[in-house]
Amino acid sequence: QNYKNAIIKAKDTDTTVTGRIAGTPVRILKNKMARTYIKKEKEGAEMMELEKYTLGSLKRAVFEGDVETGSLMSGQVAGMVHEERSLKDIIEGLFKEYEEEKKRVMEVHL
């Protein structure tokens, strides 16, 4: 739940990319782990040191709810997520919006 809450609280500027130098870019939420990783990258850390540093970080975020030292993978779209919704609600909302827009377009063109 901590991971979900972090996504919901995120603003559009709260993500960063790690792993560019190593050739394995990953967009994640900014946190202590991300800042330290980027610092290590800029200082020229070896690939193995970076791997060792991040080992288990995704597990810590997802299963243990560690939002500080866990890797909170997230796209830039995180800033647009404002609530937790079920997939069913999202799909139903999309279909409702589609039907409303289709009706509006048909009225304009008739």
Language model: regions and residue ranges:
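Conserved active-site-proximal phosphate/metal-binding subdomains
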Residues: 1-110
